[in-house]
Amino acid sequence: MGDGMNSQSQSEQGFTLIELLVVIAIIAILAAMLLPALSKAKIKAQATHCMNNSRQLMLAWMQYYTDNNDMLVNNYGQPFSALEEQNQTYQSWANNIMGWGANDMFGNRMDRLDGITQAPFYKYASSVAMYRCPADHFVSSKQAGAGITARPRSYSMNGFFGAYRPDVPNPGANNNYPTYRQFLKSGSIPNPAGFFVMCDEHPDSINDGFLQANPHTDVAPSKWDDLPATYHDGACGFAFADGHSEIHKFRSRACTILGVTFGSVNLVPFSQDPVAGTADSLWVAERAGLPLQ
C-alpha cells in the first residue's frame, strides 16, 4: 500500500501540547476579563431585586394605612416584638427577633416564620421572600449545623414610623429621641418622598423589626445607633414613604461598610473616619426623622 494508507494529516493528529497550552491561556485570560463584569452584573441584579422587594413592602405599608383609617402599622422594638411572637399576639409588622443562634431567647428556632406570617401586615405583603434581600445569604455555623439555610428577614422599619410599643405614653414623640416626632398616621408625614420607611439592616445589627437612626443633623453623632447594611457593593437599599426605593452608596469603609462577624455588631466611632463616616450618618439622619414643632 502507498504511504497515504499509514500516515495521518496534521488535522487528524489534533492539537500539539504547545497549541493546547495556548488555548488554555487564552481561555484563562478571557475568564479573568469576564469575571469582574459578571460579578458587577450579579450585584446589579441583586440590587434591582432588593428594590423590587422593598417597593412591594411599601405598597403593602400604604395599603395597610389605607384600610386602617390612616394609621401606620405598628413597629415595636425590643422586648415588645419578642413578646408579641411568644404570646402569639403578633401586633407589630414583624414580630421576630433575629440573632446568630439556632434558637431565639425563648428556645424557638431562628428560622420560624409565624412572627411574620401571623402579623396583620402579612395580609398585604404575603410572601416571605419579600422580607429578605437576595444578597443576604448569611447564617452562622450554629444555624447551618441546625439545618437553617437562611434567616427570615433582612429589612427593618425606620423607628420614627408606627407605634413603638403597645402602650405609648407620648404617642407624638419618639421613644428614644423625645424631641422628634413619631409618625403614627400617614397624613402627618409632610414630605413622603423625603423620609425612608424601610432599609436593609446589617446582619450583625438586625434583631427586632425596628431600626433606630440618630436624626440630629445639627450635631454629628459619635457612632451609629443601628447599622444599615451594605449588601450591594457598599450600598444599602432604602424605601421611602411615597413608595419609591433607591440604593444609596455609603462612603466610610471604617465606620459603615463593615464585614459580618456573626456576633455583636461592632460600631466604630465616626472619629475613626470623621469626613466619610459623618457624611454617611447625616445622609440617613436627614431622611429619618423630623423635630417636634
Residue ranges, per PLM feature:
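Short, well-structured segments within or immediately adjacent to enzyme catalytic domains
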Residues: C50-Q293
